[in-house]
A protein has these predicted regions:
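Catalytic core of PPM/PP2C metal-dependent serine/threonine phosphatase domains
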Residues: 68-71, 125-205, 219, 275, ...
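Amphipathic alpha-helical regulatory segments at dimerization interfaces
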Residues: 54-57, 70-81, 91, 137-141, ...
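DG-centered beta-turn motif at the end of beta-strands
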Residues: 119, 190, 235-238, 279
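Primarily the active-site beta-strand->alpha-helix module of PP2C/PPM metal-dependent phosphatases
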Residues: 30-40, 96-172, 245-250
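Alpha-helical transmembrane segments and their helix-membrane boundary motifs
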Residues: 1-53
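Regulatory cytosolic signal-relay segments
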Residues: 32-101, 153, 192
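Short gly/ser/thr-rich secondary-structure transition/capping motifs
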Residues: 97, 166, 212-217, 265
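Active-site-proximal, acidic helix/loop segment immediately C-terminal to a metal-coordinating Asp/Glu
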Residues: 126-144, 226, 230-276, 288-292
Length: 292
């Protein structure tokens, strides 16, 4: 039982005691009448103070959560610089006011863009704080972001050194060359991004374990080509968990294959509210057919 609950129980007993004394006293017993009224009024005052304190605490907590939500929203890209020859759609829905999903899109020199997506273990405020930490680490390394292995290595070692063992993150970092459609990526235990083109589906499988588990972990880079008309989907497991049922990835692949203008809405329409138990992040990148 919490401290506030114990206080309310004690106060309720005081009020009941005052009422009992009042009910049992002799009709003309003024001392007992005053005692009963004193106990009763004391109980009411204590209850009022306890409820007021609880209300203030709850109001402050709600205000803190709103402020944290607003801060986290500023950490996620609200507007992305135009990607020449590409279209990008983003969808983010935290389970609670704040969440442990992190995503970023960072423009780099020479027609390149860095995509980062991470899913922190846990939910709520603790996960959101670690997600903000990862965001700061990625942004601080934007000058060397073309070296994805260094990015993954640095963040992994940082988490191993400064976070508890139960706190870790799956992540994917991907570097896109706009002109060629070449995408180099490191996947640290994240749900495999899905590349769809000409009716074929390719999963960008994991190239290393999640970040923050083992210090000095070795990761690998792999490269794929996004051809004109191709679509690449980054997502956290909140998407597949939120779809539920058998083979949710297969249903996602079918939705990606829809017309480019409706692909994102087709994906999000698969979500079932009764399975919504996690943060959901989706990035859908499309290479336009007219740019080669």
């Amino acid at each position: 039982m919490s401290r506030s609950s114990r206080m309310l129980t004690t106060v309720a007993l005081l009020i009941q005691l005052g009422g009992l004394v009042f009910a049992l006293m002799e009709p003309k017993s003024k001392p007992l009448m005053f005692l009963a009224l004193f106990i009763y009024m004391t109980g009411l005052l204590l209850m009022n103070g306890t409820l007021t304190s609880e209300f203030v605490r709850k109001t402050q907590l709600e205000a803190d959560q709103i402020a944290a939500k607003q801060i986290q929203q500023t950490l996620h890209p609200q507007k992305v610089e135009e990607l020449s020859g590409y279209e990008l759609e983003m969808f983010y829905k935290p389970l609670r006011g704040v969440g442990g999903d992190y995503f970023d899109v960072i423009a780099l020199p020479n027609g390149r863009t860095l995509f980062a997506l991470a899913d922190v273990s846990g939910k709520g405020m603790p996960a959101a704080l670690l997600a903000a930490n990862i965001q700061a680490l990625v942004r601080s390394m934007s000058n060397v972001a073309s070296d994805l292995l260094s990015v993954a290595h640095h963040i992994n070692n940082h988490l191993c050194c400064y976070t508890p063992p139960e706190r870790f993150a799956t992540a994917v970092f991907a570097l896109l060359c706009h002109e060629t459609g070449e995408l180099t990526y490191v996947n640290a235990g994240q749900n495999p991004p899905i590349l769809c083109s000409s009716g074929r589906t390719t999963f960008l499988e994991s190239t290393g374990i999640p970040l923050g588990l083992v210090r000095e972990t070795q990761f690998q880079c792999r490269t794929v080509i996004i051809p004109p008309g191709g679509k690449l989907l980054f997502f956290t497991d909140g998407l597949t968990d939120g779809i539920g049922g058998l083979e949710p990835e297969g249903r996602v692949c079918e939705a990606i294959g829809n017309d480019s203008a409706t692909a994102m809405s087709s994906i999000t329409s698969l979500l079932n509210p009764k399975f919504n138990e996690d943060d959901i992040t989706i990035l859908l990148l499309k290479r336009l057919s007219g740019f080669i």
